[in-house]
């Protein structure tokens, strides 16, 4: 599911799905241009943080009662997790996979389709702009200035390049609202692990 500016009380939705018997639940914040009426705004952040806290506490309670469920944004592996490369560079857009349009054009991912500066090639000619692939290959938590001091950088891998581009005009930028929410989700995930380890 997706929550927006118009339904910030998403913890109720998640818990309702759990009450219906779903064990694997994903409800994510919408990412939209700030001109959209449903876009998450900076002033929504405090309520979203409270919702994450409410959800985390209820998940701990339910797990202890034998009625636990997974909320994907709180899943964290503190002992293993992705390989170092994935922790540094994220999803692999533009390097490990491409979006192929119905007319055969290559873009780093589906969110770049139509952004002509990121047209990498096509099915007839292959990759015609390897410099784009190189640009994405160099995009990681060490090249993103806003990631350098962030405690969550190895859990989000620098965030989404498309969101960075659409909000900052640069794939090495960041989507600050997304960063704030990611830090809170990591905090809640660690809190859940700690609370359940104490029993």
Model region roles, listed by residue range:
Residues 1-97, 114-119:
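Radical SAM enzyme [4Fe-4S]-AdoMet core and its adjacent flexible, acidic
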